[in-house]
Structure formats: structure tokens, C-alpha cells
Amino acid sequence: MPGFFQKLWDLITAPPVWRFKSDHQVRCKIMLQESSINDLKRLRSLFLKKNRYANRLFILEGYLLIKEAMISGYPLENIFFTQQSIDANHGKELLSLCNNLNVAVKSIDPKVLHQISDTKNNQGILAICKMRDEAEVFDKRILVLYEISDPGNMGTLLRTAAWFGIRTVIISEKSADPYNPKVVRSAMGAHFLLEIKTN
């Protein structure tokens, strides 16, 4: 594998331009460019519930959550890395996992990420994730969450539902938003296994 990582490193350190290589294991487009002002505005906007649902997008923060999303095939739109996170092993691993995915990879200034991030000690990695379309309920086992207002409790319940093999969760109107960044972190990847219906 050393040759593969050397090629990946060459891509990372190359000038900001679209690259496409067919002779190595990462066969996706890797867009190495700085985040635009519009990117940053969009990131900030997705920390508000109304904007998440208007765009059907939500935020993932941290290496493990983003890795879990990629492994499970959950649709990602953009991944933002600080230079330090790109240089780290987990950053290179995430780049290698983008095999066969058309995900835009952009750099972001760590100070800007710190201002945007919902966590005090972020890992320098943030992604925009697409919400699944809400399908009709077919699963016989359904969890209904009624007026669960605490984001941590909501995330724990989603995680528990996924662990017990429940695939459909219906969430009442006055409950915490299941796509709130705190809920997403607390759920620890449960979103990628569940059909979540709101309101």
C-alpha cells in the first residue's frame, strides 16, 4: 500500500485543481480547493433547523461519524478538512474511502471551522450530508418518540433503536430535531441505519 498513499499524498499536495486518476485505487474526483464564501455561508446556515429541512441537508462533525456515513453508503455532498486533518492518518483514510463517490473535498481554515463548529474541540473535519427521503412506513417494528426535547436523549434513543434492529422511527412535532448536530453526534451513526419520519 505505500505506493497508493504516495499517490494520494501527491494529490493532496498538488495545486488546487480537479484530479482524476484511473491507475490507482481512489477512482473518485478529489477537488482540492479552498472553501468559498458561499460554502461557509451554507455551512453556517445548516446549523438552523429551518435551513436543514429547506435544503434536506445536515452537518456531520468528526472523523468517526463521517467514516461511518461513507462506509454505509450514506450520501455526502461535501467534506471540509483543515490542513492538519488532511495530514493526519485519519484524514488520508477518509480520502481513500471516497472510492467510487463523487464527493467534493475542500480545505477550510481552522479558525473559520472553530467559529462554525458546534463542538469546543473539533477534529478539523466536517461534512454536509443529504437527508434521506421520508419513505412510507413498512417496518412492523416502529419506535415513536413523543416530545423528546433533549438532544442528548434523542440521540441515545435513536442509537438504541438501531442497536435493537428497529428501522423506522417516527418523531413528534415538539421533539428535538433529529438532525440537530448534538443529536447526530449522540446517535453515533444511527441515522445511517434508520428511516426517520418527522412531524
Each predicted region: which residue ranges?
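Short, aromatic/basic amphipathic alpha-helical patches
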Residues: 89-100
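Intrinsic-disorder-associated, low-complexity terminal segments enriched in Asp/Asn/His/Tyr and depleted
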Residues: 10, 23-24
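Boundary-proximal intrinsically disordered activation/regulatory segments immediately upstream
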Residues: 30-85
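Aromatic (phenylalanine/tyrosine) cluster motif
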Residues: 4-5, 20
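Glycine/small-residue-rich loop that forms an oxyanion/phosphate-binding "nest" at active or ligand-binding sites
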Residues: 105-120
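Short acidic-hydrophobic, aromatic-tinged amphipathic segments that line or gate anion-handling sites
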Residues: 32, 106-109, 195-199
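RNA substrate-binding interface of SAM-dependent RNA methyltransferases
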Residues: 71, 128, 133-199
